[in-house]
């Protein structure tokens, strides 16, 4: 993007991404502390928020202390971006061979991650429930271990959900946003179970919970070992 600015030293702050769905609200301000970002949501009667559709992709970037000189010309700076939105795809597999109906199951992610400060740290927020915006039944063939020439069918329900940041809310977020301090981000295991971001699958026929797992913990289990190379 191109901007015309007077000579001086600036902190470059970027909230960017798609805007087709109007999923996020960012106020217009010249003060970075007012440039917060809020995920738009449907308000529930119990004081919680609900997201039932796929939402815009969001990125955040911050590059402090960049100088635009007195000499007229073009100054180019690259602002590194962090992706704030994540697509979660769940495959619920039936081992008995029985066909599964996607309408039988509900998938949701619950988190307190719908408000972000100017520096991309999470602000205090109500619990937000992200519902699956796509579900379908599917079948895949698989070979039997003892009979390599035999193939059996595996039935499953596939669900897709989109959530904001995959991180836990800092216990000191209220203090941090008021004082400007920045304590270390707490790890998921330091929080009580009810505060963790959770993925829950429910059987609508029986009303029972099929599974409920701390999503951040499980995401870390499958995190790749790839590191961005340092070019010299």
Language-model segments: what does each one mean?
Residues 97-99:
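N-terminal onset of structured domains
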Residues 1-84:
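Short, low-hydrophobicity acidic/polar segments
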Residues 215-232:
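Extended, compositionally biased alpha-helical segments that mediate assembly or anchoring
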Residues 1-28, 101-220:
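Tryptophan-paired
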Residues 80-95:
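A short, Gly/Thr-enriched small/hydrophobic beta-strand-prone motif that recurs across taxa
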């Amino acid at each position: 993007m191109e901007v015309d600015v007077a000579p001086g030293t600036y902190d470059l702050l970027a909230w960017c991404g798609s805007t087709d769905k109007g999923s996020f609200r960012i106020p217009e301000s010249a003060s970075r502390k007012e440039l917060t970002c809020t995920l738009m949501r449907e308000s529930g009667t119990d004081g919680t928020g609900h997201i039932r559709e796929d939402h815009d992709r969001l990125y955040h970037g911050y590059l402090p202390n960049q100088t635009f000189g007195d000499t007229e010309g073009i100054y180019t700076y690259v602002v590194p971006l962090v992706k704030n939105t994540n697509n979660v795809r769940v495959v619920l597999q039936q081992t008995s061979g029985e066909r599964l109906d996607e309408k039988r199951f509900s998938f949701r992610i619950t988190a307190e991650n719908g408000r972000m400060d100017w520096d991309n740290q999470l602000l205090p927020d109500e619990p937000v429930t992200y519902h699956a915006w796509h579900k379908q039944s599917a079948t895949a063939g698989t070979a039997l271990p003892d009979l390599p020439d035999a193939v059996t069918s595996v039935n499953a329900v596939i669900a897709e959900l989109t959530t904001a940041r995959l991180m836990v809310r800092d216990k000191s977020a209220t203090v941090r946003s008021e004082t400007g301090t920045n304590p270390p981000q707490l790890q998921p295991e330091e929080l009580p179970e009810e505060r963790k971001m959770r993925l829950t699958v429910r059987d609508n026929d029986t009303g029972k919970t099929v599974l409920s797992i701390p999503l951040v913990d499980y995401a870390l289990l499958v995190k790749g070992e790839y590191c961005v190379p340092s070019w010299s």
